[in-house]
Amino acid sequence: MIKERTFLAIKPDGVQRGYIAEIIGRFEKKGFKLVGLKQLIPSKQLAQDHYGVHRERPFFKDLVNFISSGPVVAMIWEGEGVILSARKIIGATKPLEAEPGTIRGDLAIDIGRNIIHGSDGEETAKFEINLWFDQHEICDWETSDSEWRVES
């Protein structure tokens, strides 16, 4: 049985500032399972496809340029309620509105440099996972403590 999955990406500012381990640790501690992980410098085309919903917005070009300016850590996380939980762990898009204890509330200041991207729903997650990962890059595995994470 496939559990809920979401796509997360540590943006170039998060990578440059050395937050990869801290961010991954927050999701591991919550009990989610990492099933896809890679670091890459996204092409402009990948960035445009990823943020296509914002194509007509005035910030689109700057967003594409930023995301493709340096390394991004792309991840697929799996677990019960992972999409909503990830959104809560990440915090509000505008870091100054993000609650303390969230990634953006603790680590980010500016909306244009808000450290991390997370899928906002099930359909978006499926689209983003398929955009960033080939099927052979996804590891379907079971944790040895899965029975202790959620009630059956």
UniProtKB/Swiss-Prot annotation:
Residues the entry annotates as binding ATP: K11, F59, R87, T93, R104, N114
GO cellular component terms, A-Z: cytoplasm
Alphabetically ordered keywords of this record: ATP-binding, Cytoplasm, Kinase, Magnesium, Metal-binding, Nucleotide metabolism, Nucleotide-binding, Phosphoprotein, Transferase
InterPro entries assigned: NDK-like_dom, NDK-like_dom_sf, Nucleoside_diP_kinase, Nucleoside_diP_kinase_AS
Domain of life, source organism: Bacteria
Reactions catalysed: a 2'-deoxyribonucleoside 5'-diphosphate + ATP = a 2'-deoxyribonucleoside 5'-triphosphate + ADP; a ribonucleoside 5'-diphosphate + ATP = a ribonucleoside 5'-triphosphate + ADP
Cofactor(s) essential for the protein: Mg(2+)
Molecular function per GO: ATP binding; metal ion binding; nucleoside diphosphate kinase activity
Sequence similarity: Belongs to the NDK family.
UniProt protein name: Nucleoside diphosphate kinase
Gene: ndk
